[in-house]
Amino acid sequence: MAFGSLLAFVALAAITRAAPTAESAVCPDGTRVTNAACCAFIPLAQDLQETLFQGDCGEDAHEVIRLTFHDAIAISQSLGPQAGGGADGSMLHFPTIEPNFSANSGIDDSVNNLLPFMQKHDTISAADLVQFAGAVALSNCPGAPRLEFMAGRPNTTIPAVEGLIPEPQDSVTKILQRFEDAGNFSPFEVVSLLASHTVARADKVDETIDAAPFDSTPFTFDTQVFLEVLLKGTGFPGSNNNTGEVMSPLPLGSGSDTGEMRLQSDFALARDERTACFWQSFVNEQEFMAASFKAAMAKLAILGHSRSSLIDCSDVVPVPKPAVNKPATFPATKGPKDLDTLTCKALKFPTLTSDPGATETLIPHCSNGGMSCPGVQFDGPA
């Protein structure tokens, strides 16, 4: 399928909505929804925004977005139901088990942050809470799509087994096989899900540095990560020889402004013949990337459940902040000469400009450009 046709198909799939039914209702706050069951998520969204995210695409939002993936991907067709139930909220139901798996290192922050909401909004299952909180979190990131949200996942009774979460040191083959086993994800869908790395940072790959971003714009949902992973690496933002990390093109930091980290898995997926063209196709294609991510997330978020058994409550997901009106650009001091050898020869690489500046880009630690960020941390068992 040509990429132009693929773009149109993905965009259509991403915006499809269930038609209003006879069960449509008006919630106590006046919001009209397709089903009365969706009303319970309106106060939850308000509580999450005011108490946890504070309307910011910051660390608390980033961590909950990560949690949606780690909770959902823990399912296996080959191992069977006892391996895990997918998007089942088991991270919250078993907060002293799954968060302690090595691949989930650091996820206890988001688990502990959501546990008070699970107790307060106790008519909502933990499984629904995790996926809805992720959709609310993403809405704070300029340029993000408005995610689909299906409600009605039951509470789980068992934790997932260890070993189902892809890790940055895994080979491309192992990653693709894991996604295939989890839910028949195609290589294109795998790359689409990695758009989440444009609003992601790492604390545990290199524990000598805090909140290392994966691109130069970690507070906006844009295509920079797909460009910057294609640049030649020049150094590490912290120590070297860390498992799952390779050299980054923007390692320079200053104070709490940490340099860019490059995951070994991102590097490999951007260069592997099975995925390189998909990776490259997202560079400077904001709408295509956002629509592709939305479609892949719709599939991920219901792993372990039948779509027909769930209720479409997408209309209570907050409308995301608009995209920043800026195309993909090479960071200051970088240009076409800094591109690594491109594996994908079928696509013409877009013509991009470089940001002005004679020194390497410093990536701000906080979305407000400062060094002190708003944040919430609840105590919990994880």
Curated annotation (Swiss-Prot):
Belongs to the peroxidase family. Ligninase subfamily. It is found in: Secreted. Heme b binds at H197. Glycans are attached at N100, N155, N241. Catalyzes the oxidation of Mn(2+) to Mn(3+). The latter, acting as a diffusible redox mediator, is capable of oxidizing a variety of lignin compounds. Binds 1 heme b (iron(II)-protoporphyrin IX) group per subunit. Binds 2 calcium ions per subunit. It holds the Pfam family Peroxidase_ext. It catalyses: 2 Mn(2+) + H2O2 + 2 H(+) = 2 Mn(3+) + 2 H2O. One of its GO terms (biological process) is hydrogen peroxide catabolic process. The keyword DNA-binding does not apply. Ca(2+) 1 binds at D71, G86, D88, S90. It comes from Phanerodontia chrysosporium (White-rot fungus). This is Manganese peroxidase H4. Disulfide bonds join C27-C39, C38-C313, C57-C141, C277-C344, C366-C373. GO terms for cellular component: extracellular region. Its cofactor is heme b; Ca(2+). Ca(2+) 2 binds at T198, D215, T217, T220, D222. Its EC number is 1.11.1.13. Induction: During wound-healing and by factors which induce suberization. Mn(2+) binds at E59, E63, D203. The record marks R66 as: Transition state stabilizer. The keyword Ribosomal protein does not apply. PANTHER family: CATALASE-PEROXIDASE, THYLAKOID LUMENAL 29 KDA PROTEIN, CHLOROPLASTIC-RELATED.
